């Protein structure tokens, strides 16, 4: 069977090796006579999966001991509410840096909980770039500062993070976690939905500084407290066991190929192929993001006319490319090239883009 060239924005491509491993164990996991989906979450077999996944994440990101790793549910969207519920103090401000639709949604949820502010925004440009760090405006009353590390819809990404000392720095890394080495100690809370770089949908990874868990959250419902899940090692209630198993296998795959430094080189190679096709097209393809803010995960571009865009997408589909439609707020096309997308898929897409350009220039 020929695998599709999968450029979906999420859920997205998974490494073939991981899928094959899951397939081989689907009916009989480690001689239990059961699928991992059938195991009790209190069994020693599942607990080994659970704790191995957490340790692999620690190893790959060099997570310090004063951080907890949590496996939650509800996606990044639930984190948009959990964060202000747990950390937005009365009389203080939740300060958000707006770089796209997902940071807007995070801000919207915080407004239900308390006072908010905008430290910086590039909305006026339709989010074509990441704001200059020196332009960000903080407040002595900030309860925390929040940013989104990569913007899937607009194709922009932070390449240098702001340094924040007056308040906790919280970051949504749903679409670029583990795509490159990460200075975890620079952040107080990192969260990421799994369905782009970590595995299938259904698991949310949270990396949280233990100091934040000491806060009084008696006003927060039990399931929405980070303390609840940290105290029970993410086993307070039934976790998404199969999703965590798949997460473990993706993390093991990443470790086997050399970790974040190796995957960062691979991701740069993939991005260079597609951005190269854009830059060499004499403005036939136009990138949405400015060059200095370009994402290594989501490449966004437009063609001269809507008719050409639809023809491009139609021909691409015939050739086995999936998920290249751009988001309606940007239009055009988008190639999401997360960790699980092989270099060969990006080579094939770049070749197709060159060919289409030569035909229709």
Swiss-Prot record:
Main localization category: cytoplasm
EC number, UniProt record: 2.6.1.52
Pathway: Amino-acid biosynthesis; L-serine biosynthesis; L-serine from 3-phospho-D-glycerate: step 2/3
Localization per Swiss-Prot or TrEMBL: Cytoplasm
Catalytic activity: O-phospho-L-serine + 2-oxoglutarate = 3-phosphooxypyruvate + L-glutamate; 4-(phosphooxy)-L-threonine + 2-oxoglutarate = (R)-3-hydroxy-2-oxo-4-phosphooxybutanoate + L-glutamate
Family matches, as PROSITE patterns: AA_TRANSFER_CLASS_5 (PS00595)
Similarity section: Belongs to the class-V pyridoxal-phosphate-dependent aminotransferase family. SerC subfamily.
Oligomer and partners: Homodimer.
Stated name of the protein: Phosphoserine aminotransferase
UniProt source species: Halalkalibacterium halodurans (strain ATCC BAA-125 / DSM 18197 / FERM 7344 / JCM 9153 / C-125) (Bacillus halodurans)
